[in-house]
């Protein structure tokens, strides 16, 4: 370990000299308290260090010690149900040690060193293994089996492997490599956060990831291994959408990063998730979740690390063959941390003061998502889906972080303050949002749910767009100037908005809709539209169609439980019968 001295302190940036062997992104201990920092620039003898803790009290002449290792995370049993800070320090352990506020220079291991885990081998002595092969399993929580893998760079013959209870640092197996060297394998691996974990092959993201949110799954779907962003102004519901995705997305593991957001939002997650049951296993959602809390009152520099820490943990679970969903809330705070460090380094600023390399850093982050064939001889598939929230100041979507994000992600869920103020949630604007996965998902849904899924979706989108243009006319000349056909379009589009797209995140039934239920709900509205068109053609007055009591049954369909979807068949019959009754009644009057 080489030791240098501080020459300058500027907020979270410390400049030091006397570290000749230092490398980029090495971790250093700064000052007498040993604050954790990372080298982000080397110029001759001088190194610039971003410190992940409060730097008040540091001054020129204080010592700096280089560890010679990059910032890494510990990967192994004990991460699930855990809550960590941006550099993977367990907050519950710190709280027991020093109380509610994190003191500076505290050094605690990320994974519990005392707890013993029951290890069950999957290979035997004499078997040949290579990087990524699963050599055994640990039942980490009731619903997640933690698969212990050979580190990527190691291959050889298993010399010795034993079943039993071990801590994460005790050897569970010995492998004789091709060069004759004996390597001891533990349940814990260390991995540098800025380096993507390797895989065999990247696959096209073709399988949809149901989220239970109707506006997302039907109109703007995301796939397993896809990328999505949620930009929106303050108060438009970004965090609630992220929480909904974390709760109900069809993923086996969820990694939730609270990056520079309010602390009470992480508290909500900590209080809600243990109470909520996973619909597939009926176990608490917390048992498949890893939380990284880097709230707005924590040091700014650690925000940058938190995003990398989270995605490295997510990649590790992906390598086991799991489908993983990563929520980053919010990437704007991360970009602001980049901007602050760039300013302190006196780099040339780009647009709005952000560094010129902002787009590259964002692309590198989203590039780590994907559906892959993992390393290992069993060719297992894993997927990592990334959903990033963006908080543009004043909801201005033309600002650099939103624009750089839109260049790399395939799904854009635009949150609208007007919809939010009108209490329409989720406030995803159906006219400006898009999904580049919709064609792939449409093929999948046509095969697996119903052959007319694609037609229903296209018709619903057409009606919503037609409604927007008709509303312009209504504002100018009033609704009475419209033909009855146009008034029906407005009425059906309103039904799509209020009875289908609007969803209550806090209602026990409406919070989640299966793909089957979403299809049945949309089909009801479209059957009403078709039957009402026939009634209009036969001369039935529009006012009678509009006021018919069957409309209320369509509106209440969202509260039908998943186990009672046969109710939709009855409502379909009622709609047809009601419209037929209006036609026959009109004919009798004539």
UniProtKB/Swiss-Prot annotation:
One of its GO terms (cellular component) is proton-transporting ATP synthase complex. It catalyses: ATP + H2O + 4 H(+)(in) = ADP + phosphate + 5 H(+)(out). The keyword Plastid does not apply. It comes from the Bacteria. One of its GO terms (biological process) is proton motive force-driven plasma membrane ATP synthesis. ATP binds at residues 232-239. Its EC number is 7.1.2.2. It holds the Pfam family ATP-synt_VA_C. Keywords: ATP synthesis, ATP-binding, Hydrogen ion transport, Ion transport, Nucleotide-binding, Translocase, Transport. GO terms for molecular function: ATP binding; ATP hydrolysis activity; proton-transporting ATP synthase activity, rotational mechanism; proton-transporting ATPase activity, rotational mechanism. Gene3D superfamilies: 2.40.30.20, 2.40.50.100, Bovine Mitochondrial F1-atpase, Atp Synthase Beta Chain, Chain D, domain 3, P-loop containing nucleotide triphosphate hydrolases. Belongs to the ATPase alpha/beta chains family. This is V-type ATP synthase alpha chain. The gene is atpA.
């Amino acid at each position: 370990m080489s030791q240098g001295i501080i020459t300058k302190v500027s907020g979270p940036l410390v400049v030091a000299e006397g570290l000749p062997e230092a490398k980029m992104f090495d971790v250093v201990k700064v000052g007498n308290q040993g604050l954790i920092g990372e080298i982000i620039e080397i110029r001759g003898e001088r190194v610039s260090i971003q410190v992940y803790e409060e730097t008040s009290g540091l001054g020129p002449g204080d010592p700096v010690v280089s560890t010679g290792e990059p910032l890494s995370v510990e990967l192994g049993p004990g991460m699930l149900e855990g809550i960590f800070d941006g550099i993977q320090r367990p907050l519950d352990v710190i709280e027991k040690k020093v109380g509610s506020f994190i003191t500076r220079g505290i050094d605690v291991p990320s994974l519990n060193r005392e707890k013993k885990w029951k290890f069950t081998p999957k290979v035997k002595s004499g078997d040949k293994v290579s990087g990524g092969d699963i050599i055994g399993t640990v039942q980490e929580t009731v619903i997640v089996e933690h698969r212990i893998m050979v580190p990527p760079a190691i291959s050889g013959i298993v010399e010795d492997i034993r079943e039993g209870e071990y801590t994460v640092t005790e050897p569970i197996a010995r492998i004789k490599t091709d060069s004759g060297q004996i390597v001891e394998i533990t349940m814990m691996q260390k991995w540098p956060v800025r380096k993507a974990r390797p895989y065999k092959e990247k696959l096209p993201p073709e399988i949809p990831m149901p989220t239970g949110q109707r506006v997302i799954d039907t109109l703007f779907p995301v796939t397993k291994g896809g990328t999505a962003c949620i930009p929106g102004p303050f108060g438009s519901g970004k965090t609630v959408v992220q929480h909904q995705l974390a709760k109900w997305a069809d993923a086996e593991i969820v990694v939730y990063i609270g990056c520079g957001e309010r602390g009470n939002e992480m508290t909500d997650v900590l209080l809600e998730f243990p109470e909520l049951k996973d619909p597939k296993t009926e176990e608490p959602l917390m048992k498949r979740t890893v939380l990284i809390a880097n709230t707005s009152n924590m040091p700014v520099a650690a925000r940058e690390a938190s995003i990398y820490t989270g995605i490295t943990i997510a990649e590790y679970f992906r390598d086991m063959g799991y489908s993983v969903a990563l929520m980053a809330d919010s990437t704007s705070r991360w970009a602001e941390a980049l901007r602050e460090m760039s300013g302190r380094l006196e780099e040339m600023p780009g647009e709005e003061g952000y560094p010129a390399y902002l787009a590259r850093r964002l692309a590198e982050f989203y590039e780590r998502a994907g559906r892959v064939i993992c390393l290992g001889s069993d060719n297992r598939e894993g997927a990592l889906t990334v959903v990033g929230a963006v908080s543009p100041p004043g909801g201005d979507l033309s600002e650099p972080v939103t624009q750089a994000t839109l260049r790399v992600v395939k799904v854009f869920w635009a949150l609208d303050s007007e919809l939010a103020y009108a209490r329409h949630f989720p406030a995803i604007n159906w006219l400006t949002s898009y999904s580049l996965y919709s064609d792939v998902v449409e093929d999948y849904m046509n095969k697996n749910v119903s052959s007319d899924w694609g037609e229903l979706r296209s018709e619903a989108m057409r009606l919503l767009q037609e409604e927007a243009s008709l509303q312009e006319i209504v504002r100018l000349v009033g609704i009475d100037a419209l033909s009855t056909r146009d008034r029906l379009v407005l009425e059906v589009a309103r039904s799509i908005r209020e009875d289908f797209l609007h969803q209550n995140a806090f209602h026990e039934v409406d919070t989640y809709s299966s793909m089957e239920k979403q299809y049945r709900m949309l089909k009801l509205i479209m059957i009403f539209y078709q039957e009402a068109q026939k009634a209009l053609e036969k001369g039935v007055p529009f006012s009678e169609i509009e006021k018919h009591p069957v409309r209320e049954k369509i509106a209440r369909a969202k509260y039908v439980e998943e186990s009672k979807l046969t109710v939709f068949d009855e409502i379909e019959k009622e709609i047809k019968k009601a419209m037929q009754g209006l036609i026959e009644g009109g004919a009798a009057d004539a």
